[in-house]
Amino acid sequence: MARYLGPKLKLSRREGTDLFLKSGVRAIDSKCKIDTAPGQHGARKPRLSDYGSQLREKQKVRRIYGILERQFRNYYKEANRLKGNTGENLLVLLEGRLDNVVYRMGFATTRAEARQLVSHKAIVVNGRVVNIPSFQVSVNDVVAIREKSKKQARIKASLELAEQREKPTWLEVDSAKMEGVFKRVPERSDLSADINEHLIVELYSK
């Protein structure tokens, strides 16, 4: 399955909420009709069944993090193997992806842009270049912009925009040095309350 490259706002309208696939700073313009699904009959919102609600929640989270279906299912299997709450484990695994950490640290305006930085070898972890977006960052890992990439205008612009976003408490970022530390694993209370991971667990538990 190919990665979605179409209009980002269409995905947000499909899920009925801002997925922050654009800049991650400003809310989507009211003219974009976020509460109306795309298409000719978007205004008609059929009542979802339990399965429909579970599926929509899974699609929403998958799109937020930019994960393909097969990869998302593998994350769920891994979360289920770990001790503790499966749903929370799933979110922690997704938050620990290198592309997500790069985005959270403010080096990119979107996760898609962060994924591109990683793939183009602009990111180092503990001094070594890592070009795998799904690389799992561990506690105390130092994530930084590669020296030769620090002059990129888009990275500097992203750091400026990041000042307008709420800074994650589980990360420590030095914007001047363009590096950050993954201080701790995020707790559920640190993450979006707009995600209902229990619905995803119910979906995959069937």
Curated annotation (Swiss-Prot):
SMART domains: Ribosomal_S4, S4
Any one Gene Ontology cellular component term annotated for this protein: small ribosomal subunit
Domain (S4 RNA-binding): residue spans on this chain: 96-156
Gene3D superfamilies reported for this sequence: Ribosomal Protein S4 Delta 41, Chain A, domain 1, RNA-binding S4 domain
Keyword set includes Transmembrane helix: no
Function per UniProt: One of the primary rRNA binding proteins, it binds directly to 16S rRNA where it nucleates assembly of the body of the 30S subunit.
Quaternary structure and partners: Part of the 30S ribosomal subunit. Contacts protein S5. The interaction surface between S4 and S5 is involved in control of translational fidelity.
Name of the protein described by the UniProt record: Small ribosomal subunit protein uS4
Organism: Haemophilus influenzae (strain ATCC 51907 / DSM 11121 / KW20 / Rd)
